[in-house]
From Swiss-Prot:
<dbReference type="GO" id="GO:0006000">
    <property type="term" value="P:fructose metabolic process"/>
</dbReference>
<comment type="similarity">
    <text>Belongs to the FBPase class 1 family.</text>
</comment>
<dbReference type="InterPro" id="IPR033391">
    <property type="entry name" value="FBPase_N"/>
</dbReference>
<keyword id="KW-0479">Metal-binding</keyword>
<dbReference type="InterPro" id="IPR000146">
    <property type="entry name" value="FBPase_class-1"/>
</dbReference>
<comment type="subunit">
    <text>Homotetramer.</text>
</comment>
<feature type="binding site">
    <location>
        <position position="198"/>
    </location>
    <ligand>
        <name>substrate</name>
    </ligand>
</feature>
<dbReference type="Pfam" id="PF00316">
    <property type="entry name" value="FBPase"/>
</dbReference>
<feature type="binding site">
    <location>
        <position position="268"/>
    </location>
    <ligand>
        <name>Mg(2+) 2</name>
    </ligand>
</feature>
<feature type="binding site">
    <location>
        <position position="84"/>
    </location>
    <ligand>
        <name>Mg(2+) 1</name>
    </ligand>
</feature>
<keyword id="KW-0963">Cytoplasm</keyword>
<feature type="binding site">
    <location>
        <position position="103"/>
    </location>
    <ligand>
        <name>Mg(2+) 1</name>
    </ligand>
</feature>
<dbReference type="GO" id="GO:0000287">
    <property type="term" value="F:magnesium ion binding"/>
</dbReference>
<dbReference type="GO" id="GO:0042132">
    <property type="term" value="F:fructose 1,6-bisphosphate 1-phosphatase activity"/>
</dbReference>
<feature type="binding site">
    <location>
        <position position="103"/>
    </location>
    <ligand>
        <name>Mg(2+) 2</name>
    </ligand>
</feature>
<dbReference type="GO" id="GO:0006002">
    <property type="term" value="P:fructose 6-phosphate metabolic process"/>
</dbReference>
<dbReference type="Pfam" id="PF18913">
    <property type="entry name" value="FBPase_C"/>
</dbReference>
């Protein structure tokens, strides 16, 4: 069984990018240790502050964010980073080759109940010109991503990663602290009978999305002619991990009070879309590919429908009223 770095070498990943991934993976391993200690080290619960998104911050949100930033600042290949938890970009090394976007702790509302958690990240190339980086340098589409992944803090510590040559899943071997390739070349089934939507928000969604949900709940007697199962873990990483492995569709539509959806384009939607499309799936905002969206803010939000190809294409038809 190959380890992470053997696979990266086989995929001809540049040494500089490998070293950057090593920094990210190392930081996530440290985050996993802090999560595992949980209540034993008083890292659960909320803080009195809100983050830039207006959301209540969990203690582990801040801990995970600080661990990642500290690790990335030490890496000379990093020009700048953008974090979901921080209002502005963070400048690192003026000669660095890479820009990194990350959500340090996806699903942090699950921290107090020992639920699914994850870290999501993507990497793009910085401008070759040695100029000061600004927020606008992060405004490239997801097609410019050169590597993306997530770490799932579950029963096993798992890394899903793509450097543009397919999507692979690695599992941490605690006996030697190496990530081993356990699920190579993922291939999401084109059809599915599983969906991951938070139906408690259904009344807030556009009518066409509501109709899609109603139709798939009618079972074998309805227009879809089959039964669907619902899965919802309260963490995008957890739901998407299942979809990468077994197929399905994840949806977080726009809502009445959130015209552009709630998930962030740079920190959540783009990295997951990159992984999914590298695994034969699709990722859409309801009408067009997420990866073709040009950002206008580092904290831009976007509606998300990601997963099995035929199901994503179908929901686009519903969005068009077909």
């Amino acid at each position: 069984m190959k380890n992470l770095y053997t696979q990266l070498e086989q995929d001809n990943v540049p040494k500089t990018l490998t070293l950057l991934l090593q920094s990210i993976v190392g930081a996530c391993t440290e985050i996993a240790t802090r999560i595992n200690h949980g209540a034993l080290s008083d890292v659960l619960g909320s803080l009195p502050d809100h983050n830039v998104q207006g959301e209540v911050q969990k203690k582990l949100d801040v801990i995970a964010n600080n661990i990642l930033i500290e690790s990335l600042k030490k890496n000379k290949q990093v020009r700048a980073v953008a974090s979901e938890e921080v209002e502005d970009i963070i400048l690192c090394n003026s000669f660095g080759k890479y820009l990194i976007c990350f959500d340090p702790l996806d699903g942090s509302s699950n921290t107090d109940v020992n639920g699914s958690l994850g870290t999501i990240f993507s990497i793009t190339s910085a401008s070759a010109a040695q100029t000061e980086v600004s927020e606008e340098d992060f405004f490239s589409t997801g097609r410019s991503i050169i590597a993306a992944g997530y770490v799932l803090y579950g029963p096993s510590l798992m890394l899903a990663l793509s450097t543009g040559s397919g999507t692979h899943i690695y599992t941490l071997d605690p006996s030697n602290n190496n990530f081993m390739l356990t699920h190579p070349n993922l291939n999401i089934p084109e059809d599915t009978n599983e969906f991951s939507f938070n139906l408690s928000n259904q009344f807030k969604w556009p009518e066409n999305v509501q109709k899609y949900i109603v139709d798939l709940q009618l079972g074998t007697d309805g227009i879809r002619k089959k039964n669907f199962n619902m899965r919802w873990l309260g963490a995008m990483v957890g739901d998407m991990h299942r979809i990468l492995c077994k197929g399905g569709i994840f949806g977080y539509p726009e809502e009445k009070n959130f015209k552009y959806g709630k998930l962030r384009l740079l920190y959540e939607a783009n990295p997951i879309a990159f992984l999914v499309e590298q695994a034969n799936g699709l990722a859409s905002n309801g009408t067009t590919s997420i990866l073709d969206t040009v950002p206008s803010s580092i904290h831009q939000r976007i509606p998300v429908f990601i997963g099995s190809k035929n199901e994503v294409l179908l929901i686009e038809k519903y969005a068009l009223g077909k």
